Structure formats: structure tokens, C-alpha cells
């Protein structure tokens, strides 16, 4: 019997992996979606990677997805003398928006509004929180600070402002240019960095729709404001990424694990995919095996019910990109075969807009457990059936058959789902026979297995799911 992980794997492409052979090996090892980090690399390099991914999809009949990760208003220090200087606790240092070469007394920032955004007493964290200064005063151009935690202050390190309401828009000029490129390439998912409210998502969606594209949005949760507005953000977006790197700097680190679990649960209830990201197997940047703590981190994300887990520098710049995917895949497979992670059968609220079709999908998930079905099939043009089925986390594999080409690779991010392109509009019996033959040919079912089919009747109507049929494979 054929097998695929229900919990999906995102692998970030970078200098260690941006070639045909490595991307093909990453896919063979278990990667489902490839992340293109637009904080780095030119459009030409990203174009080449996109072409490689689509070539592999054609050659190997795969549905590898592409996620474009926009940089967002990343605040950084400027260039430093000797690429880095030492600052010590108690030192006085000024951050200016003038483009100067920095030293131990004066450092520039690329973010022009920093002196206007901060106030006396605000903390400024640099280099993922390894360095900390506190604001003494600001004159709208220069921010005078006292060093709290010192170290080597290097060129172009990131700045986090955990106490400050940043005035920068969620999309910078660079992001808008990168977005145009991503839309022209019809990427599957666009990740928006430093989301603070649902308005950030709404603005991005309007830009996507204005271009007539169907890319879906991932809201990256990495700001305190995002936690405050998490419910409205989940409602507005198509998926969530718990970006624990910046989030763990912006908020107290001890609250991140509980928020991770809360967000996963909220996303399952909302039928929105959720990705757990950052430092999942960080040691594999230089080591061939993960630590026991990293193994537990990945395992806990799977046990919580995350749709996907993500590798960043491990596959982008690490020494063992393929090993990292293999290790992650091995952890996922063991848990999915041995842990009690299935059948989160949520009751559908009576005021739900799709109350009837949602209940039918719930019954399909519940029935799959009772009859030990091997597959649940959703015939859909919007993908709604796939998202809703996945939210119930059935033990049966979920197969989406659709005439919508965009869904084929988009669904690669969704827990437990594999998609097929199916554009015939024939009788119900013919359609279900085609589906059975396809799943049989690909090794997902065999004679005697139970399939649960769901669809909208009549099939050509593109309406809401209103039909469920049990079928035993001949």
C-alpha cells in the first residue's frame, strides 16, 4: 500500500539546496511544500527554483507546493566598522536614521521612523535578543540608549521592538515588487510577515484579487499585537504560521509553547491550516542528526495536530538538508502510526453558514472511524471540503478530486490531503468508478477496502456538499 505523511513538511530553499538534484532529493525524502524566502535572493534565482519545482512535479507526477515568504518591514541596524564592534552593559549608544558606518557609540538603522516610534523606557532588542538596549530619549532623528545586555554588534542584524507600536506598513516597497513577481509566477501560498491585525491580511488579499490571481495567504504570527488579534486574523487569513523566532523575542519566551497549542486548536476549529516554524531542527545546520529536544519539538507539533512543520536554515544553508527532511519525516511517520492523534470531531455551531454541508462532512469523518475506511473522497471546486475534512483529523487518507488546477498544489499544505485533477462531468457512477480506479492504481486502496465519497449533487453545479456514499472497492 502507498503511504504519505498526513502532517506536511515545508522545506526552505537556499544556497544549500537551490539546485535540481537537491530539490528532487528533498521531495523524495518527504518535503511537500517549498518555501522561498524573499529576504534573500534575486528574482532570477527564485525563478530558477520555481522552474525546477514545477519540472519535478511534471517528471514525477507530484504536487509540490510553492510558498513565497515576503520579508515584511524587517528592522535592521546598518553597516558596522569591521563588520562588528563590542558593546558592554552600561555603555551609552545612539541609534540614528542617518546612513553612517556604525561604531561602539553610534549605529544606524535602515528604518527611518524608529526615532519617532520609540519612547523613553522602550526596550530595543538586537540580533534575536542577544543584545538589549533601553531608550533614554529620542529627538525624532537620534535615539539615545543605555546598553543592558552587551556583546558583538554586527552589521545588518535584526531589531525587535517588543514594547513599541511600529508605524511601518505590513507591505514595504520591496514586498510589493516581490508580490508582483510571486503573483506572476502563480505561487500557491504567500506568507505575510509581522502581521499585526486582520487589516494587514485584507490589504494583501485586495492586491491579490486586483491581479486576478488565486494565491492563498499565510499570516505569520510573530508580533504581540498578532496574539491580541489572533481570532480576527485567523478569520481573515487562509492559513497561519507560528513563526517562533521573532515571536519568542517579541514576547516572553515562556508563553510561546502555550500560544502555539492555542493557535493550533483555533486553526483546526476554523478549518485553517497551521504551520509550526523556526528552529525545529536547528542543530542539523551543522550536525547529521537532530537533538533529542528537537525530536520532541517536532513530535509535540504533530501531537498537537499542526498541519505542517517547517525547516528553515536546516535546508536553506545547512550541511545536511536532505537528512533534515528524512529525520522530520521519520518522526512524523512513527507518531502517525502509533499515537492517538485522530478523530477530532468538532460539533458544528448551529449558526454556521454552511451548517448542513459541514455536518455531512463531519458525518463522513465520524463514519470513517466506525467502518475503518481507507479513504475519504471530496469532489470540490473550492477546496472547502478538503479543508473541512482535514479539520476533523480522520485516520483515513483524504483525497480531493477537483477541476481547479490551483488547488492541486495548494492542498499540499493541508493535513492528510492529497489532490487529483479531475475535470470530467459525467454521471455520478462513472465519476466514482474513475476515482476508485485512480486510488487503486496509485496503491492507496485495494479490493475490500471502504471508500467514503462526498460530493455536491448534481456534480456540475459546484454547489455545497450534500451527498455521502459508502463504497467497497471491488
Give the positions of each predicted feature.
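Non-catalytic helical/linker scaffolds that mediate oligomerization, partner binding
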Residues: 1-474
